[in-house]
Amino acid sequence: MTQLPQPLTPDELQKIDAYWRAANYLSVGQIYLLDNPLLQTPLTLQHIKPRLLGHWGTTPGLNFIYAHLNRIIRRDDLNMIYIAGPGHGGPALVANTYLEGTYSEHYPDISQDIQGMKHLFRQFSFPGGIGSHATPEIPGSIHEGGELGYALSHAFGAVFDNPDLIAACVVGDGEAETGPLATAWHSNKFLNPVHDGAVLPILHLNGYKIANPTILARISREELDQLFQGYGYQPYIVEGEDPLTMHQLMAGTLDQVLAEIRSIQTRARLDGVTQYPRWPMIILRTPKGWTGPATVDGLKTEGSWRSHQVPLSELAKKPEHIQQLEAWLRSYRPEELFDTQGRLVEPLQTLAPLGNRRMGANPHANGGSLMKQLRMPDFRKYAVEIVQPGQIEAESTRIMGSFLRDIMCLNLKTCNFRVFGPDETASNRLGSLYDVTPKTWLAETLPEDEHLAPDGRVMEILSEHTCQGWLEGYLLTGRHGLFSCYEAFIHIVDSMFNQHAKWLKVSKEIPWRRPIASLNYLLTSHVWRQDHNGFSHQDPGFIDHVINKKADTIRIYLPPDANCLLYITDKCLRSRNFVNVIVAGKQPQLQWLDMDAAIKHCTAGIGIWGWASNDQAGEPDVVIACAGDVPTIEVLAAVSILREHLPDLRIRVINVVDLMTLQHDREHPQGLSDREFDTLFTTDKPIIFAYHGYPWLIHRLTYRRTNHANLHVRGYKEEGTTTTPFDMTVLNDMDRFHLVDDVIDRVPHLGYKAAYLRQIMRDKLVEHREYINRHGEDMPEIRDWKWTAP
């Protein structure tokens, strides 16, 4: 018979098992108990919560892992954070941070005594208390784990440029079936052991999801091993259900994998690295609901999907369930774990690491406390020189790329800035970055490859999920970054944005959570210039999605030209605790504002462009507004036509950069008051508004405004194909000719005076259609149009 390794002494084995039992006891108590936290009297229904909420099934495994990580952190003085992919096992994170003391340090009313334990139990999944997941309220958490799939990308993002940090990342076997998680395994091809830390993936195979078996738990051991070998890992399998045996197996395996991690890093830091090493990982196979009730009402529960949430759920109807719950709680022998005052007994207190080595106190999990300010060049140095508006063209994002290049250069030593994108950095005209840094790449390279190196700082993988997960992990641990993406395909991470915005919303309400750098999106290759890729690439709806979140968390910017984009980029990279969405084109387009004017305009977020207006002597007859670079071009072209043909028509031109200025100041901190809004848009004049996205969003933002009844919005209305740039605006009635027609329709006194102009506009639309169908490009008067002041 083979003798199993015994890395733990009998005393260590007894203590680590007791510590695990303590965490399990506290976890069950959180799910069930209102009172009688140490079972000092027989358990009754009055001691139990009326609504039982929580997830037991994954929790004992999370507790098991946490206890063993504590051992090696304390022994080896490791710098480690814990990422719980199955974040629905929130009781485990609360229990362990309570045992190590960090929870009570942040929440003194949750003291380490009987009263504190009672409060700890009562607050869990209870009105006025805390949620059921690994929420921001839990010290040490950077990953809530409510929506599954992002644990591994968060872990890798956290250790980029953190050479001493290890992220122990527990991946649930249900989560492992998600697309984002499946791709995130490839993050090992982007992890440089010279200047990055390490990720220790721990795949927790407990066999079941909510009501189904998991795929990875039902394939052969050989296939499972080959799968992760194929991903480039060295898997170590730890499996069983006898606690004492499993403690020895887990301890021995952790000793081995930590030695391998140290060896990989030591070799790389001495000799350099050209390809990714084979990092170790652990596959932990334990029963779902381990140590819980074996059966409930005669049905298998431990080791079954039935233990996923609350194994005993009908206590009011079934008194025998109360007896079974008490037996379950007493099976952990709490009298051995806590003294009569409710404190963890002293011998077990020595198992937790000390100070900031406790995973709940690790400063990397409160990244704002470590954040260094970005060194930023003066954005004014990159200004496009403007003598007259609308005379020269520039590629706005290319100008932005030069600015980002120099930000990258200034922060190379501090290693706290990266740019992320799904194979689109060059396409989005940010290629200047490659003047100072390549793309990170540790897989095979070929002689013809360009801009690939192990030490690059541009992160590209064709997975929007992985890009955002990396960036979120990077930001949450105190660094800075930018995510550039095609506008239509940012929808792939709609729900990831949701989760991060929710995290920020809650974090702002927690005094000890320090502000982190904002998550900055650059959305380009946008709807109006996806004429070459066609309908599938045309969708501006991410803005509509973002705007649903809390006003103090989101910002949306639509800079009309390069100088405005420079100002907005600088502003966003300096901001904290926001999600900033910047929408800007990459194609050559007319430029409008010199830098001084751009700063003034963007500081306000909205304003009258006096040089394009002619209502200075009195009230306007019509207000024509625009938001977005292409709508700005079409509005100004329409204004030039109107001023040429109807010189007596008084026109006010308004440009909106900060979309949230349209909302009322009671609803958004950037919003205008009614007085300010009415001063700009009047209380009774027609408003023609050309907007980058779906037009109903403008109505939604302004529906309470005095003059909303006179507001007419043009924007994208799901008409598109592979066609010319100008035809995209025509298909959606947002072109200059339709806008002129809209003005004629809505200014009452024009009437017959504008009949000839209306006919010209309709003829122009026919001429446009005939021309593009014949020549395959826009008419010269469209392609070559420039602003001329009448």
From Swiss-Prot:
Keywords: Lyase, Thiamine pyrophosphate. GO terms for biological process: carbohydrate metabolic process. One of its GO terms (molecular function) is aldehyde-lyase activity. It is an enzyme of class 4 (lyase). InterPro entries: Phosphoketolase, THDP-binding, Transketo_C/PFOR_II, Xul5P/Fru6P_PKetolase, Xul5P/Fru6P_PKetolase_C, Xul5P/Fru6P_PKetolase_CS, Xul5P/Fru6P_PKetolase_N, Xul5P/Fru6P_PKetolase_ThDP_BS. It holds the Pfam family XFP. Signal peptide: none annotated. Its EC number is 4.1.2.-. Its cofactor is thiamine diphosphate. Belongs to the XFP family. This is Probable phosphoketolase.
